[in-house]
Design a protein with these regions (language model features):
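A short acidic, Gly/Pro-enriched loop at the edge of an enzyme's catalytic core
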Residues: 94-107
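Short glycine-dipeptide loop
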Residues: 61-62, 130-136
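A short SAM/SAH-binding and catalytic strip from SAM-dependent methyltransferases
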Residues: 106-119, 142
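Conserved Class I S-adenosyl-L-methionine
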Residues: 4, 22, 48-50, 174-273
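Short, conserved SAM-binding segment of the class I
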Residues: 54, 121-126
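Conserved class I S-adenosyl-L-methionine
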Residues: 1-39, 50-54, 74-77, 81, ...
Length: 273
């Protein structure tokens, strides 16, 4: 049964739990990138460090992993993963100027590239910190087809009398298709070896868990609109909550509420930059 439990979670703790869901396509990204023992890896948008910890165990004592995330509270959690070859720092894709040229073998951007406004500049900086022949692995929300949750929230907002969800803060304006991402990579000195769509399926216990997951990315970016109910009057919040629970009935299965996601996966090598 779909639950109406929408108790507030502490953002960092919710992010830590729910980023575990992102780990399965993070692991797929790592496999695509061919990370090996001894590699020096930079993860931009590491959150609470789930994927960075996984990578640190692969690269071993001769390698190192640096994770960047804008939220101090997320980095505090990441630093509890006391692996000697993993360093977690507060920072964003705009802060790569602090890193030395050619200081990494691999750069990872797992489920965060679609939130970057100046994507070309960020990719150019990623190229700069990579050695010649270094690899970049990206997973990002695809422009098309839409995630199930996007279709779902469009209907929820219409039924609650709030229009549709287009332009809401969680609908990123910076989503790309495969051709656009390939073009950006080539423009800053990368040669794409693979770019394409991959589907993923998630199961959720209740409405609150759906909301936590879908907005944990915004919380990770330090965006206070991660809890989209906060800006609505109580009456509107109740309407959205009821409409969401009603719509999710159609997605309820014996395994939980099923929602599908469509991600672009890209791997490229640095030719110049």
């Amino acid at each position: 049964m779909v639950s109406l439990d929408l108790e507030a979670r502490l953002p960092a703790e919710a992010d830590d739990r729910l980023r575990g869901r992102l780990l399965h396509h993070g692991k797929a990204l790592v496999g695509t990138a061919g990370i090996r023992p001894g590699d020096r890896v930079l993860e931009i948008g590491c959150g609470t460090g789930h994927l960075a910890e996984f990578v640190a165990r692969i690269v071993g004592p001769q390698g190192r992993v640096v994770g960047l995330d804008p939220r101090t509270v997320a980095i505090d959690i990441a630093r509890r993963r006391t692996l000697p070859n993993f360093t977690a720092c507060v920072g964003t894709a705009d802060d790569l100027y602090l890193l030395e040229n050619a200081s990494f073998d691999v750069v990872l951007m797992n489920s965060m590239f679609h939130w970057i406004q100046n994507q070309e500049q960020s990719l150019a900086e990623a190229a700069r910190v990579l050695r010649q022949g270094g690899r970049i692995g990206i997973s990002a929300l695809a422009k098309k087809p839409p995630h199930t949750w996007q279709v779902l929230f469009d209907e929820v907002f219409r039924s609650a009398g709030l229009g549709d969800s287009a332009g809401r803060p969680w609908i990123s304006a910076y989503r790309l298709d495969s051709d656009e991402l390939s073009h950006l990579l080539a423009k800053v000195g990368f040669q794409a070896t693979s770019v394409g769509l991959r589907p993923f399926v998630d199961y959720f216990a209740d409405v609150g868990e759906v909301i936590d997951f879908e907005f944990s990315a915004l919380n990770s970016l330090g965006n206070s609109t991660g809890n989209f109910f906060a800006g609505l009057p109580a009456e509107k919040r109740a309407k959205v909550r009821a409409a969401l629970a009603h719509e999710l009935i159609a997605y309820d299965t014996p395994s939980g509420i099923r929602l599908d996601r469509h991600m672009i996966f890209a791997l490229a090598r640095k030719l110049w930059g």
